[in-house]
Amino acid sequence: MRLVIAEKPSVAKSLAAVLGAATRKDGYLEGGGWLVSWCLGHLAGLADAATYNPDYAKWRYDDLPILPESWRFTIAKDKRDQFDVLRTLLRREDVTEVVNACDAGREGELIFRTVYCLAGCQKPMKRLWISSMEDSAIREGFANLRPGADYDGLHQAALCRAKADWLVGINATRLFSVLYHRTLNIGRVMSPTLALIVQREAEIDAFKPVPFYSVALDLPGFTAASARMDKKADAEQLKTACQGGTVTVKQVERRDKIREAARPL
């Protein structure tokens, strides 16, 4: 029996339909020599600081920085039942191989590996790596399963990202909140993004409009405009020179241009 673990129920159902696992069970599908189950996104995550030391429940400057020597994980309370299903399946004696069918990416790798490790599973692991949910793509993916070890680096990268988020979020949030006597959430991604917004707002506030002038000629079928000029007198001079004259089109050039959407701020 081979166990397939997808990242979400909808994906698991699509995989099961192709594999012939049509019998619905509690938290998984079975059939054709396959067990197909699913996570619900991240079933587990890095534990909060208070898990390491109850004293960390209170935010104090003297406790910083908080640097776990051995990282711990906790199961999300609202997802405990599905984790128990997966753990039971992973420990079944008739399951000889596990297929990681979570999303093809860094986070998908972390979602599966976390469950796999917390369940204490050491069974052979394969990786399904597909970018399409078409039946043909699924069949091809299962025909070309890769060794799970090929993606150890991806798992380590995802775990590094998660730990970096934890270290910055826990320590910086507590530091600034204690110093300024108010809750100030700091994040590895959130704070730089907020800084970009603040910087843009400052640019808008400092903007000073500068007048400019140009001369436009209304011609049959199109309008021809001059370059911008800083001085009105220069524009008036060009306007006077054009009045009563004859326009000759010497060259026509057509180009497709992509106009980017205006920035939200």
Q: Which residues make up each language-model segment?
A:
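Long, highly charged, low-complexity internal segments
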Residues: L43-K77, T88, L184-L265
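Alpha-helical hydrophobic/aromatic positions enriched in membrane-embedded helices and signal peptides
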Residues: A157, R182-L184
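Intrinsically disordered, low-complexity regulatory segments
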Residues: M1-A162, W166
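Conserved, well-folded catalytic cores of nucleic-acid-processing
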Residues: V18-A22, L46, L89, L118-Q122, ...
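Short flexible coil/turn linkers enriched for glycine and charged/polar residues
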Residues: R92-D94, I170, P209
